[in-house]
């Protein structure tokens, strides 16, 4: 959750974590299938703009997310169900070179969710503020999906 430097792609980084009692097979579709995000998150709309191949939500898919009229687009760049999802933001954030990876790890009591990303700010001097915003947002996503998955696992 600290800045790594001042230049080049990925100069600012973050990492958040959450745990759920649900197995990875329950958590994976909630994160991997774009349309399911609005079930468990604060997003008002979620879905695919373009399907990936061979899996519609996999590599090459462009996902669109909206929260109260503000949207973002991201491309899936890594796909290893039910353990790893990587994506790059195409639009919607004031950043360049944004890359994030969500990793699901089986643990004795369920699943550990790790969300890590890196970016460069488009506007000089805004990196630390964006980093703080992204840490809070991604922690909320991780906590919300963990809590929702806990309920599905009951």
Indicate residue ranges for each PLM-predicted region:
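A conserved amphipathic terminal alpha-helix motif
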Residues: 112, 118-154
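Short beta-edge strand/loop motif at the mouth of beta-sheet-based domains
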Residues: 15, 35-71, 82-84
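Hydrophobic ligand-binding cavity/cleft-lining segments
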Residues: 1-51
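Short, ordered beta-strand-loop transition motifs
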Residues: 7-8, 51-59, 78-80, 105-108
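Short, P/G- and charge-enriched loop/turn segments at secondary-structure junctions
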Residues: 2-5, 59-63, 89-90
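Hydrophobic-ligand binding "helix-grip"
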Residues: 38-39, 66-112, 118-120, 148-151
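A structural signal for short, well-ordered beta-strand segments
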Residues: 14-20, 102, 115-117
